[in-house]
């Protein structure tokens, strides 16, 4: 059975998923030589970096990125668009690109 879900509803689902799977995110200034004043990272309670906002790009922890692709059955472009909307909703920053953080 297929359902039609609005984009706003999907952003809310991503909101709930991140809250349930990652927990509360804490914002820290980005400690990088080329970081702008507005750049930062979002870490979970254990201190692991989940998102990095650097030079208008949003880096997403690789395992989380892959899980979200699979769980929501999205392609990369669709996930990038949703994460961009989620980020703008919560952190009011302009995102030009979204990418997995590969370590």
What are these regions (language model features)?
Residues 21-30:
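Short, charged/polar N-terminal "headpieces" of proteins
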Residues 94:
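Positively charged interface segments
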Residues 7, 20, 42-45:
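Intrinsically disordered, low-complexity segments enriched in Ser/Pro/Gly/Ala and basic residues
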Residues 1-18:
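Short acidic, low-complexity intrinsically disordered linear motifs used
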Residues 3-6, 97-103:
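Short acidic DE-rich linear segments
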Residues 32-89:
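Acidic, low-complexity, intrinsically disordered interaction modules
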């Amino acid at each position: 059975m297929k359902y039609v879900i609005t984009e706003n509803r999907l952003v809310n689902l991503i909101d709930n998923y991140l809250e349930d799977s990652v927990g509360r995110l804490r914002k820290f200034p980005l400690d990088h030589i080329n970081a702008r004043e507005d750049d930062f990272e979002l870490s979970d309670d254990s201190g692991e970096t989940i998102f990095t906002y650097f030079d208008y790009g949003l880096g997403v922890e690789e395992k989380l990125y892959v899980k979200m692709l699979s769980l929501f059955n999205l392609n990369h472009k669709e996930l990038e668009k949703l994460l961009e909307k989620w980020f703008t909703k919560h952190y009011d920053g302009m995102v030009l690109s979204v990418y997995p953080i590969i370590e």
